[in-house]
């Protein structure tokens, strides 16, 4: 069938298999052009199908020549309904890896569950022995507590007081005022349970207990801080509370891994167009301005550039750590001159000048690319088989 983008709010409900494959191929090509990294050899990526998780799986496989086990929870095609972009991404990476004689194992299931943890441990024992790097890059709206069975939901709200600011509807290019209401205590706790560090710790404990962690193992979870303009909705909101919990967990994981000479890190990454960030009010406008400023300065990076740089710094012993022992690959975003330029543009921006003062057009293009649309070298008028790549 011919696949076109269809939307429900900020969610694209269709994905293009050939476009997703091209997107993965472009990231692989970037890594190949930039050379090998002497690093991890057996890698577990939790949340491997999109964004920073997908980039981590690609860099591990292509730059480090590592065996990779990727866990994700994606939808296969059914009838005339396409598979999710993440499903096509994983299938594409699997095909490219197999074509190069590399080992890439994928598990499609709920990484929060005990069943998937057990399945992954068995697969590591059978195929890899032990892993020397665990990437934690899970993003989900809900999580079922594996002990109590209770289902928790995450939400995007402020903490304490409502917050009004401007945001971008990237479909129309309109700048609108938006008010975000504060979360209840229950919503704050729900978001922490879904997006905090609890499940990361459960994974590390389960892997250690099963004796599938190599001596000197490293584990990294991804976080974001950003500038003050986004604090009320992000860093000081429900998501920020969950990220604080995630960051606190890194210190606790260090204690768990001490006997293995292992290390747990948080990597604070750059703001990028992802399925998650496009739905966050205020952040979409900030990213549009950020992209314009960083491209003009020649410092813009996407997921693959960020993660390649992080792996290189990690394994060459050149990590840029802050006072809280967090890896900072958001350094170029948070550079004083970049943030000063954004602060100057922010109060001036309106629906009339948004395409002039920001990269709103590119935000939209990048969003479409997440689902395999708008990539060069893909004929979108062609009939495609939506069940495969």
UniProtKB/Swiss-Prot annotation:
Entry keywords, A to Z: Fatty acid biosynthesis, Fatty acid metabolism, Lipid biosynthesis, Lipid metabolism, NAD, Oxidoreductase
Binding locations of substrate: 224
Protein's pathway: Lipid metabolism; fatty acid biosynthesis
Binding site for NAD(+): 47-52, 73-74, 110-111, 138-139, 243, 272-274
Keyword Cell cycle: no
Site feature location: Plays an important role in discriminating NADH against NADPH: 74
Enzyme Commission numbers on file: 1.3.1.44
UniProt cross-references to Pfam families, sorted A to Z: Eno-Rase_FAD_bd (PF07055), Eno-Rase_NADH_b (PF12242), Enoyl_reductase (PF12241)
Family listed: Belongs to the TER reductase family.
Assembly description: Monomer.
Name of this protein: Trans-2-enoyl-CoA reductase [NADH]
Species whose genome carries this gene: Clostridium perfringens (strain ATCC 13124 / DSM 756 / JCM 1290 / NCIMB 6125 / NCTC 8237 / Type A)
Lineage summary: Bacteria, Bacillati, Bacillota, Clostridia, Eubacteriales
Recorded name of the encoding gene: fabV
């Amino acid at each position: 069938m011919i696949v076109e983008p269809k939307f429900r709010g900020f969610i694209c409900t269709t994905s293009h298999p050939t476009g997703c494959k091209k997107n993965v191929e472009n990231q692989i090509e970037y890594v190949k052009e930039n050379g090998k990294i002497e690093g991890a050899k057996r890698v577990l990526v939790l949340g491997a199908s999109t964004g920073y998780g997908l980039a981590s799986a690609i860099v591990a496989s292509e730059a480090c020549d590592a065996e990779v086990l990727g866990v994700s929870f994606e939808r296969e095609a059914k009838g005339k309904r396409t598979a999710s972009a993440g499903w096509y991404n994983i299938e594409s990476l699997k095909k490219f890896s197999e074509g190069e004689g590399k080992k890439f194992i994928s598990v499609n299931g709920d990484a929060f569950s005990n069943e998937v943890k057990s399945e992954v441990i068995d697969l590591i024992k059978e195929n890899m022995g032990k892993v020397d790097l665990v990437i934690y890059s899970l993003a989900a709206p809900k999580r079922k507590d594996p002990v109590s069975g209770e289902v928790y939901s995450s939400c995007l709200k402020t903490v304490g007081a409502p917050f009004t600011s401007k945001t971008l509807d990237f479909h129309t290019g309109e700048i609108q005022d938006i008010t975000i209401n504060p979360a209840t205590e229950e919503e704050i706790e729900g978001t922490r349970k879904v997006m905090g560090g609890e499940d990361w710790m459960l994974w590390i404990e389960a892997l250690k207990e099963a004796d599938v962690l190599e001596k000197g193992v490293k584990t990294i979870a991804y976080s974001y801080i950003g500038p003050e303009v986004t604090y009320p909705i992000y860093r000081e909101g429900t998501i920020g509370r969950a990220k604080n919990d995630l960051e606190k967990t890194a210190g606790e994981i260090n204690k768990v891994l001490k006997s293995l000479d292992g290390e747990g890190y948080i990597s604070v990454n750059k703001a990028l167009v992802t399925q998650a960030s496009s739905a966050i009010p205020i952040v979409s406008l900030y990213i549009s301005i950020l992209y314009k400023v960083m491209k003009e300065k020649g410092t813009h990076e996407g997921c693959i550039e960020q993660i390649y740089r992080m792996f290189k710094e990690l394994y060459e012993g050149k990590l840029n750590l802050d006072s809280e022992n967090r890896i900072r690959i958001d350094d170029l975003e948070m550079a004083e001159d970049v943030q000063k330029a954004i602060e100057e543009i922010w109060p001036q921006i309106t629906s009339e000048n948004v395409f002039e003062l920001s990269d709103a057009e590119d935000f939209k293009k990048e969003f479409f690319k997440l689902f395999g649309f708008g990539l060069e070298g893909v004929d979108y008028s062609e009939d495609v088989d939506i069940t495969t790549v």
